[in-house]
Each structure stands twice: as C-alpha cells, then as structure tokens.
Amino acid sequence: MDHFFQSERFEDSYCTYPNLYQQFAQQIQDGGTIVELGSWKGQSASVMCVELFNQQKNKVRFFTVDTWEGSEGEGHKEDKWIKEGKLYDKFKENLQDVENYYIPLKMTTEQASHHFSDGSCDIVFIDADHTYEGVKKDIKLWKNKIRKGGTLAGHDYDPAGKSWAEVKKAVDESFGNDVMPVIGGCWMVQR
C-alpha cells in the first residue's frame, strides 16, 4: 500500500518523522505493542498503519491515544474540526483505509496509562501535551510501561532549544545524557 500521509486529507502537516515510524515498524516483532500519545488528525498514525500493513505485521497492537479535543498550548482550539466537535470523526475518516491496523483510545494519556501494565509496551511515542508539566507527566506515567529493550520517544524536540523549549527541558531533565535526538525533531530513549 502506498503512503498517504502527505495527502491533502490531513490539511496540516505535523508528521516530520515518517522514517522514524518506518524504522519502528521494521523493528517491532509481530504481536508487539506500540502506543502513540497524541494522534490529532492521524497523519503519523497513517505512516505506522501503512508500514504494518506492508510488512504484514497483522498482530502488532497499535494504540492511538487522544481526547480529540485539542489543547490550548498548540493553538488547536481554533481548528475548524474542534470547533465543530468533529475532530475524532476527521481522524477516523483520514484512517479509513487502514482501520484494521490501529486501536483508538479516546481518553487522556493518564487514563490510557491505566490500561497498560508495566513492561507491556515495545514503543511509546509522546506527542500530546507540549507543556513542560504535560511532557514530564507523560514521561513519568509511561516510562515504566516500556519493556526492557523497548523505546520511549517523542516529537517536537529541538536540541538547540529554539522551539518547543518546554519539551526539551522536560525530556532532558528526565533522561539527561540518555536522550538521543533523532531526525524529524524527535527524541528517543532505549530502556
């Protein structure tokens, strides 16, 4: 299946890391668990779903976690889909071609964390609340959910600290020298 994450259906382009998601899909064993915190309109989720389909990894459980209500910090409240109360519908519409490759959890990241036991996740990708407090909270809630050898990663990490400074501060304080900046404005930590 061809990728469609660059199609106009997504309206805005936040997925700057398709290669990272492709790498995750290649590395994960069939039957593994991936959790994406913050899925917005599904652009990055579409990359993962297409990769899982193309690699015939039908047993990977890929969870997308979002309230689909937007957040103040990113200016999402002005988005037309949020104003109409239809962002979740837009997300599902955008991913209709790969609907069997993801499991949506319409809840907060904290609520979702209670659905996963420690060591049960292979990969958790944090891209939800971009405030310092929000990122710290998500790291605290999810870092122990990662199995040994698994990956905790996230988006909007600028090593120079020029943009999304609160994300960088929270990640650096949590992991220090263990943080690996990766292409596409992402960060990663191996457990």
Language model features: what each stretch is:
Residues 2-191:
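S-adenosylmethionine/decaboxylated-SAM
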